[in-house]
Amino acid sequence: TFIFLLSTSNFLKSRYGSQFFKPIISVFQTKNELNKEYVFKNNVYIRLYQSGFEVFKKYPVFGVGNKNYRIETCSGEINSKYFCSTHPHQIFFEFLAEHGLAGSMILFFILFNLIFSKIKTILNSNNYLQLGCLIFLVTSFIPFLPSGAFFADYNLTIFWINLSIMYSVGKKTNVYTSN
């Protein structure tokens, strides 16, 4: 669905194609090391991802804490490896930087278990509302796709609303009516 929308929508083409995919593809197509370095230094998303990874390397086990990424990257002693922002704009780097390996493994286990434990039931139910919620939840975790801060009020609210609707509208997935 996303690939279809990306290929038909001019807005999505310019948003994701020119800002994210095109620079990455150009890195692999060029043999010139200076051009690769230029792309990596001037692409905002790549710099944000690198910054998130650097924060994770500094605090690998427990991370910097929830919503503390900005404090680490925007403090007075700005490290040249960091790109000052509120979050790294990618869910995996955000979880690793803020919660480390321990917290990320726990969060991903819980979230993936909630989302994927009922996937077979949802796909067989022909319930389009459940399927739409499932697609939204799965696309929230597409690797290297820029995203908003997961723990920001808006993003987390939309995520939990979709998860709640996915579970509540089906007879076999509703915890109050399932056997």
Please provide the spans of the model-predicted regions:
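Membrane-interfacial segments
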Residues: Y16, K118-N126, F150, N174
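Transmembrane alpha-helices of multi-pass inner-membrane enzymes
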Residues: I110, G132-L145, A149-N179
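Long extracytoplasmic/lumenal interhelical loops at the membrane interface
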Residues: L34-H99
